[in-house]
C-alpha cells in the first residue's frame, strides 16, 4: 500500500492567523507544487512519510549556553560574547577543533578556565523543552522516521579511549558515533525517539549552509518534499526552504502540535500507546 502525505495549502501558513510560518517549496516548479501526495524515492516504499528532521538545541533540548554558561564565567551574555574568540565555537561545532583546543583559544586573551566545570554546568542545564518529549514519544509510536539535524560539537567524555575499545569489540561506526553525544544522552536519552544522524561536528558543515541540507537529502535518499524540518532559528528554516524542504519555525510545543496536525502528521495517542 502506497504511503501518501498531503501537501498543505501554502496560503494557510502565510496568513496572520497561522500559529507559526511554514516555508514550503519556494523554488519548486508549479507541477511539483500541484502534486497532492508525496512519494518515496526508489527503494524507500516501506518508510512512513514525511521524514521528520529536528534541530536539537532550543527546539528539543534547552540550550544552557545563553544563561548557565555566562553565569559559570561570572559574566553577562553580552560580556561573554565580547571576550570570547569570534570563530572558536563555530570551528568546534564543525569538528575542526576538539574541546582541548577550544579551551585553549575560547577567550581572546588566552585565559584558562575549568573545562570539566564548564561541561558539568552544561550537563546540568540540559532538559527537554516543555511538552517535547511527549510529542517525540507519540511520533515514534506512530512509526515516523525521525532524525536529529543539528549544529552540535563533540564533547569528549573519555571518548578517545572508549572509541578505541569499541573498535576492538567490533562495534559499528554509528554505535561509536552515538558515544559522542553522551552528555545529552546520559541525561535525556534522546536516542529513544530519534537517530543522531546529521550533526555538524561529523559532517563538517553547519546550518544554514545549503550543502548541509543537500547532504541530508542525499543520505536519506528522498526528495526534499518528503521531509519536514523543525528549527528555532529562522535563518535555518529559510535555508531549508530554499532547497525545497517543508520547514517549520519552532516557537513552542503547542504551536508545533498545531502546525504538524494541520500538515497531516498523525499526533494522535492511541489507547495501547498510553499503556506503554
Where in this protein do the model-derived segments appear?
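Short acidic capping loops at alpha-helix termini that bridge into adjacent secondary structure
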Residues: 192-196, 224-227
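Conserved Lys-Pro-Asp/Glu-containing loop-to-beta segment of HAD-superfamily phosphomonoesterases
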Residues: 206-234
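Generic structural signal for small/hydrophobic residues in well-ordered secondary structure
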Residues: 55-58, 95, 148, 197, ...
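Acidic, Mg2+-coordinating phosphoryl-transfer loop and its flanking beta/alpha structural elements
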Residues: 224-262
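Active-site neighborhood of HAD-like aspartate-dependent phosphohydrolases
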Residues: 25, 31-86, 90, 243
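A metal-dependent, Asp-based hydrolase signature
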Residues: 90-120
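N-terminal chloroplast transit peptides
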Residues: 1-24
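Short, acidic loop-to-helix structural element flanking the phosphoryl-transfer center
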Residues: 48-51, 115-150, 154, 158-173, ...
